């Protein structure tokens, strides 16, 4: 049996449930420590299949999947994975250059990015939007006093963040609009998506957004701007036009069977073709 104290920070370990401790012990024994990124994806897929999840039905099976301890493993994994930390630092550096007074990380999970940002911008108000944050995440964030967990967005923000969120939800256009409504005009939304079949919980009915996301955001009124690692910054220009974004999304879905025939690495061409066909 693996000694969790050698792999899990004490502040986190004392907040884990018996089920979480048992699962982590099993995983660490199976992989002789932390699994690789690909093995974490494998573990997620195992649970998706074990719960019998259907990507077309967001029901209690999917809810149970997202409550499984594999997501605690994912949060801990990111805290020590070099590539993930590189992304986090790059996001933080970009955010710090924007100097927002108030920002929120929507679906910020374990709060790692928010803690980085809170330390880089000690005078900023940093919120992690999660209706049911894990006690361990709250405990770890306590050392960064300007970071707090909130159940929902409220009021107006200078900057919003959503990383690896929209590929998991059935209506990403609607959720993007709902959240962007809290962004001040001229504010920026840092979004990083993966509309690709990396893991089973990336909904396949959304894969057309790999090429159609930027055109849809532009139609909505969120102008695509600077690329930041695997994400992009979108600036709010004014009122949000959700029907226009949905039209682009629907057109992108129809174009997708042809777009996906492009060679790998041709995302820019796919986006350009989608924008041309769906303008």
Positions of PLM-derived features:
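Conserved N-terminal segment of class I S-adenosyl-L-methionine
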Residues: 2-155, 176, 192, 199-278
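A conserved beta-strand element that flanks and buttresses the S-adenosyl-L-methionine
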Residues: 161
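Short catalytic micro-motifs in class I SAM-dependent methyltransferases
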Residues: 164-168
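A short glycine-rich, Lys/Arg-flanked "PGG" loop and its adjoining helix->strand segment in the class I
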Residues: 174-185
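Conserved beta-strand signature within the Rossmann-like core of class I S-adenosyl-L-methionine
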Residues: 186-194
